[in-house]
Amino acid sequence: MILATTSSTCATLGEMVTVLSIDGGGIKGIIPAIILEFLEGQLQEVDNNADARLADYFDVIGGTSTGGLLTAMITTPNENNRPFAAAKDIVPFYFEHGPHIFNYSGSILGPMYDGKYLLQVLQEKLGETRVHQALTEVAISSFDIKTNKPVIFTKSNLAESPQLDAKMYDICYSTAAAPIYFPPHYFVTHTSNGDRYEFNLVDGGVATVGDPALLSLSVATKLAQVDPKFASIKSLDYKQMLLLSLGTGTNSEFDKTYTAQETAKWGPLRWMLAIQQMTNAASSYMTDYYISTVFQARHSQNNYLRVQENALTGTTTEMDDASEANMELLVQVGETLLKKPVSKDSPETYEEALKRFAKLLSDRKKLRANKASY
């Protein structure tokens, strides 16, 4: 979608709920990290503030799998109550830790990676920080294999579900614990009245199939109902939403299609390998299609921007290839994506659309600050 400033948008900008959603995709998280770095740089330039951070501008930041990790990095506070990581720190994080995270365990019967290094680095970076301390509302998904239900970690749910005030490193590992790749994660939380809760969690993509945009919008809707700063919003609809959704790239080889004659001879293993790829691609497409349709039906299509590379090839399609050569290729994918047109119908590039998005975010922040001062 092409983001544009309209008179109706400006009229209600101060009351808009801003949402950032980041897909899952393992090491391919480098692609949205490049986009986030560009956007944060634009916000710093527009507001003439080198300390400006994404968490200052978005009411809700949601992510699944590697998107959940990015969410935690830009919302978890440091000792100065500022995000412990700037957007420009994310790509170096992948380069430093990616090869150790995706270091084959050598196990034939167990998961491909033991997850020990991932959990260790998350503990070191995120410390004892819990959900309630996040600098803005978060929406990080996981799936409990014991209860067979999704688990959504958000600040706005804590009043009714205090057991969800887990440590951020437990949440981040859980949302990244993709079956086959990493072991499930078990941890326990205790509420203030002494109740004990157990969690047996795997990758959030099981709950959201990689794209948490709809989840993030749902959390934003609830936030507008319970947060006093949105008291002037009587009935939230998509006209009052500003959504930026970042993908981790799709495999262009998925588009080669298969014939009925070819697949008729496939066995369970061949289908198992192909169907996950098909499901992820189809789900991401349908999520984007649904959101686009709903925003358009509300005459708010300019409030939604999906940034996605749809032509990944070779090693860049792999979520666990953390070789330096492949990570460099993923950086190039992200940088090239910024120069590509948002749609076939317009010459506007993602870079130009994100600059416009940054201006809207800045204006919205200033309008809300001015309103709060009266």
Swiss-Prot record:
Q: List the SUPFAM superfamilies hit by this protein, alphabetically.
A: FabD/lysophospholipase-like
Q: What else is known?
A: Patatin have a dual role as a somatic storage protein and as an enzyme involved in host resistance.
Recorded GO molecular functions are: monoacylglycerol lipase activity; nutrient reservoir activity; phospholipase activity
Q: Which UniProt keywords apply?
A: Coiled coil, Glycoprotein, Hydrolase, Lipid degradation, Lipid metabolism, Plant defense, Signal, Storage protein, Vacuole
The record's listing under InterPro entries reads:
Acyl_Trfase/lysoPLipase, PNPLA_dom
Q: Which residues form a coiled coil?
A: 309-372
Single GO cellular component annotation? vacuole
Source organism (scientific name): Solanum tuberosum (Potato)
Q: Which domain of life is it from?
A: Eukaryota
What Pfam families does the record tag this protein with? Patatin
* Glycosylation sites (chain numbering): 103
The Gene Ontology biological process terms listed for this entry are: defense response; lipid catabolic process
UniProt keyword annotation of Signal present: yes
Family per UniProt? Belongs to the patatin family.
For this protein, the Enzyme Commission number is 3.1.1.-
Enzyme class label: hydrolase
- Motif GXSXG per record, residues: 63-67
- According to the UniProt entry, where does the motif GXGXXG sit in this chain? 24-29
Q: Which comment does the entry carry about domains?
A: The nitrogen atoms of the two glycine residues in the GGXR motif define the oxyanion hole, and stabilize the oxyanion that forms during the nucleophilic attack by the catalytic serine during substrate cleavage.
Residues covered by the PNPLA domain: 20-217
Q: What does this protein do?
A: Probable lipolytic acyl hydrolase (LAH), an activity which is thought to be involved in the response of tubers to pathogens.
Q: What is this protein called?
A: Patatin-2-Kuras 4
Q: Which residues form the signal peptide?
A: 1-11
Q: Where is this motif: DGA/G?
A: 203-205
Catalytic residues (UniProt):
65 (nucleophile), 203 (proton acceptor)
